[in-house]
Every structure is written in structure tokens, then in C-alpha cells.
Amino acid sequence: MEISHVNIILFSLDTVRADHLSCYGYPRLTSPHLDRVAQQGAMLLDFYSPHIPTYPGHTTMMTGRDVYAHHVTGQSTAFEPTPGIPMLAEILRQDGYRTYAADTLGRWFARGFDVYEGYEWSKEEPRHWRAGETVTSVALNLLDRAVTEGGPFFMFVHYWDAHTPYYPPPPFDRAFYARDERDPANRSM
């Protein structure tokens, strides 16, 4: 029996809570575009991060191993996954997938990707991550490339915009609390 390879796109919205996304039942319309993607694809209903912060949690997601097995226990490039533990992109590449990533961070998750479009942090930059619009633009270019090259592909798209510091652009800056955000009675955050 021949196994069909489906294309896989894994979106990671760093620090976004599923219970605040409308596709997961939140009563406010907070994620209309993601809702449309979710209607056409697969959604995980019970998915929990095994560790914080980002690097250990995502390494577990990419290896299927706990932090005590892969040894990424902190938020630094000083930590590398244990040699010999395959990353998801490596496994899929061995199975015939081409692998692409549009990441908001540096090269934390680059192992196993044929094309990894990361972002090098700079102390001169006012924010140390790539804006979502840029990640989306990079991802769409990679998607065009993947389709043109043909065959099955895996793409990892990693957004950081919802991460601290919380500076949403207008009009979203007042979507949940329209009064003085310094008011001690403000319990919206």
C-alpha cells in the first residue's frame, strides 16, 4: 500500500492562548483568518506546552521529547538539543518532504530545514523579533516556492507578536479595555 504524503503547515503563535481564539470557542471574534484556516485543516483540541519558555517548549514540540531528554532548558543558544535526537524537520525530510521555515527568531529551530528564513536579533533594533507581517510575507514566498518545486512539503511558521511586551497597534490597543490602562481596577491583563 502506498502512503500519501500530505503537505503540512505548522503555525506557532507564541504565547497565544487557545481559549482566546474564536476558532476554539471564544465568544469574541479574535481570529477570523485563523478560523478560516482551521475550517480547512486539522486543529489540535488538547495541546499543552510541556515547558516554558519558548525554546524548551518548542524543542519538545519539534522532537516529541521532554526537556530532560533533549536538554534545552533555557532561553539561550547556549542550549542545543541533545545530538542524536531527531527534529521533526529531519524526520520529515528523510521521508521525502522538503522542509521550509519562516521564523520570527534566530536559528533556534533551524536543524533539519532545507530553507530556514530566521531573524537575527540586533541590540540596535527596538524590538527583537520579526513583525507578523514580515513573517507572513516570507511564509507566502516560501509557500510559492514549495508549490513550484512540487512534491510534499513541511512548513513551520512561527509568530511572536502576541509575546511581551504587549503593544498592540490601533485599533486593537483598545479592543478589550478602552479606559486608562494604568487604572488599578483594570483586570484585563
Indicate where each model-derived feature is located.
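Catalytic domains that recognize anionic headgroups
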Residues: 1-189
